Amino acid sequence: IKGYDPRFGIYKLGFPNLEVEEGFVKYLLPFYTSISAAKTPFEIGRFVQEVESGNYDAFFRRLQSFFADTPYEVIAGQKPERDTELHYQNVLFIVFKLVGLYTQVEYHTSNGRIDLVLQTNQYIYIMEFKLNGTAEEALRQIEEKGYALPFSGDNREVFKIGVNFSSET
């Protein structure tokens, strides 16, 4: 045993070589547990580690995979454009809350509302969402409305993230 993550109850095992590791994964692990060697694209422990380490590129790739796997019937309602953007905002809010991260949606500032603010011990993520727009438009809104200003007195690193969701993909 090389390590243990008490938060998720995960042990990190070390193997002397690839042959021993493959034997463990293929033969012993399935025999003693109901765990398969396959991992889902949205493995919650890895997602949390990416967020907490500031690896926003990796966690957004993981989210993109997660959203691509969402059945289209559960997304759009009476106002498809607005409902779709709200769907993505709600899913992100729920995911971040479920993993125990401090998350706020529609965070009010003196110049508008930030779609989502996510805070960890080291980072603050300011996220603005666009549907069928561009990430650049979302970033421009963060800048023009001064969404980072309320956090300027905080010593944590601030990430400004513009996110575009496509209703086509």
What residues fall within each predicted segment?
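C-terminal structured domain segments across diverse proteins
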Residues: 127, 141, 159-162
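Nucleic-acid nuclease catalytic cores
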Residues: 135, 148-169
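Extended alpha-helical interface modules used as scaffolds for assembling large macromolecular complexes
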Residues: 1-137, 144-146, 169
